[in-house]
Amino acid sequence: MMARWVTAEALDHLATDDPSALRSRRDLRRVHRAMGTRQILLRAIRATQMYRQRAGPLRVLELGAGDGTLMLGVAQALGDAWPSVELRLLDRQDLVQPSTLAGFAACGWAAKPLVVDVLEWAGLPGAASAPAMGAEPPTATPAWDLIIANLFLHHFDAAPLARLLAAAATRSRCFLACEPRRAGAALVGSHLVGLIGANAVTRADAVLSVHAGFRGQEISALWPASAATAGGPGDPGRAAAWTLAEHSAGLFSHCFRAERRVAAGRAP
């Protein structure tokens, strides 16, 4: 299979209110349905230790959250399993609608947008960047029970991605990602998104996303505690800190999970 190739996607450069961008974001909801993204995320969440423990309240951060509707679907599906969640929806654009926030509230989730570039977030000592909308004060260093990234990590080359993952490892108990799979079947599927009514922006970006996607253990290799994988080399102390899992999911997706093996309190 081809080497990983990251190219800027068209949607990233369109204004929030550009008609093509508005249409493309609607397309993404159909793409998620076609890929079964919500069910993939639900399975990943239900496989975590924190889900089995049903501990709460929980603090959750979604990176590259977009309009927040995918995560809302996850919250609705989880139902009473997680009745009390503090959620931050991080994106560099302010796309979350009041109706979406109301939907989270109906699930018992307190959701707020966090408008900041993720690399700014990753480069600061705290978990947020003031004066970004919805951000905590610059002196705060909150930890997250769970950080989620969905169709987001593939936007980054290895160096910035490693920086992002290092920030996630420092600030979370668990990190989940669902990304495009870099494989022949996924590439064929990306050329067919027009069949579900996708516009030109979405059709072009779908192909680019597969070329920038992942396979094998590529995300694990960039995780700062990658020695946590079974039989991996490295410092035994670091190996004891995390359990990693990386695998294909469905026809088109690639999943990664990193979870602290000792869940004693908040992450540092």
Where are the regions a protein language model picked out?
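A short SAM/SAH-binding and catalytic strip from SAM-dependent methyltransferases
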Residues: 145-159
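Conserved beta-strand signature within the Rossmann-like core of class I S-adenosyl-L-methionine
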Residues: 172-180
